[in-house]
Amino acid sequence: MRGYISDNGIYTYHGIPYAKAEERFVTATEPDSWDGVLDTTEWGPISPQGAILGGSANEEDNGDNNCQNLNLWTPALDDGKRPVMVWLHGGGFSSGSANGGNTDGTNLALNQDVVVIGVNHRLNVYGYLDLTEYGEKYEHSDNAGLTDIVASLDWIKENVAAFGGDPENITVFGQSGGGAKVLSLMTSPYAEGKFQKGIVQSGATETLGVTFATKEQSLAITDKILTKLGITEANIEDIQTVSNADLQNAATEALAETGAEFEVPLAIGDGYGMEWGPVIDGDYLCIL
C-alpha cells in the first residue's frame, strides 16, 4: 500500500481496510484483496452519524455502513517493535470518527516513538440495532459496532509488525465514548488476548451518560423502530434498503420512547431517554 511521509518524517496511512460490511447489521468479514498498490493517502469512509443527547441525526449524512478502515502513523517501517496505541474516538456510540486533525496521531508517534492507529467503525443504529431475533444472519447485530473494533484488533495484531509495531504490546485508549468502548472490550470474551492494556479517559459508564442497554431494552427499541418503518418478520430484509434519514428518524423517536418506558434518566437535563450503545447480551458483552 502507498501512504505518505509527513513533513516531520512520520509514515502516514489513511483508510486502510481491516474488514468489510456488505450488508447492514451483519458482522463484517475480511476485506477484499487488491491488485497492485493500494492508495492510502486519503481518509476512508466513516459511519453515518446518529443523534446524541436527544438531538436529531443529519438527514443529509453521507456516511457509509462499509466504514471498516483505520488510520496509522509510525516513525519507521522497521522491526523496532514499538508499542502500539489504538485510539477509539469519542462521540458516545452514536457519532464521531477517527478522521481529521483532532485525531491525527503524528505528534504522538513522533514524540513517544510509538505506532498510533485510529479506528473507524459502525455507530448508532448501524452498530447496535438488535435484530438477533430475526435469524443467525443477525447474530451479533446488537453489538455490530464492537465486532468491528474487535476485527480491527485482529488486523492490527496480524499486520502491525510490518509498520514497526509490536503485536504483543497493544494499548487501546479513548476519551468519553471512546473510553466506554475500552471498557466494553475489557468485558468481552471476543476481545480477549487481542490487546494488553487499556486507558479510559473520562469514559465511566452509567455516571457520564454512557449506558449499556439490557436485552429487554434493546429489543424494545428494535420493536419500535420496525413498527415505525412498517417492517415485520415477513419483510425484515427491507431494513437493508430503508433510507438513512427514515432509519435515523425512527431510531431517534424509539430511543426517546424506550427511555421513557424504562425510566432511563437523560444524561443532561430532566426527563428520560436512551442513547445508542452496546447491549449486555451475556455473550459478546458481559455484565460490567
Indicate where each model-derived feature is located:
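Non-catalytic accessory segments of hydrolases
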Residues: M1-L146, P167
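Alpha/beta-hydrolase active-site loop
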Residues: C67, Y138-A162, E216-K224
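Alpha/beta-hydrolase fold nucleophile elbow
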Residues: P83, I156, F163-S176
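A short beta-to-alpha transition loop/helix N-cap that caps and shapes the active-site region
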Residues: V125, A180, A204-F212
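Short glycine-enriched nucleophile-adjacent loop
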Residues: G179-A191
